């Protein structure tokens, strides 16, 4: 799971020990089921291939639930997983009010907004902004980390960044 490279038809490369080591694994099974780390490979060119499209019937409505409302979440910021610049804050920011400064910096740089798990757990920001082993994996051109301790779980989510700027006290 979470492969970062393909060496052959049955040989794959994947991180282990929270990204501290790389393992080469092989599979002799005829059918292989793998997951791919989102930032590990370049995107395929648009229109590079075709795939079969199969229409399926709608599920039967059992009447046990109902839609109260539908709203599309909108943001001026780029999507976290595909942004070229990410500004992330950690517990070192100190408070939800101080985290608003991180949001302003992200807006000025037209960057996506990220956070460490500690900042999410402290209630500074929602978990949809979490970067790391239990959050999103990012690989921007520029990653700005403000008040982030550098826990290995967070590093696992942003180690593919081209340039990393860390700001701490």
For each feature predicted by the language model, list its residue ranges.
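N-terminal glycine-rich FAD/FM-binding segment characteristic of electron-transfer flavoproteins
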Residues: 1-169
């Amino acid at each position: 799971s979470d492969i970062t490279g393909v060496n052959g038809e049955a040989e794959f490369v994947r991180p282990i020990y929270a990204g501290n080591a790389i393992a080469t694994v092989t599979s002799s099974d005829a059918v292989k089921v793998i997951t791919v780390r989102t930032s590990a490979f370049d995107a395929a060119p648009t229109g590079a291939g075709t795939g079969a499209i199969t229409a399926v019937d709608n599920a039967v409505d059992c009447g046990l639930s109902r839609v109260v409302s539908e709203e599309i979440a909108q943001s001026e910021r780029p999507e976290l997983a595909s942004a070229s610049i990410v500004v992330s804050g950690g517990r070192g920011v100190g408070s939800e009010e101080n985290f608003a400064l991180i949001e302003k910096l992200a807006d000025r740089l037209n960057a996506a907004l990220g956070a460490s798990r500690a900042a999410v757990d402290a209630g500074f920001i929602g978990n949809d902004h979490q970067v790391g082993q239990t959050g999103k994996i990012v690989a921007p051109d520029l990653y700005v980390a403000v008040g982030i301790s550098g826990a290995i779980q967070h590093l696992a989510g942003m180690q593919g960044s081209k340039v990393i700027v860390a700001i701490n006290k």
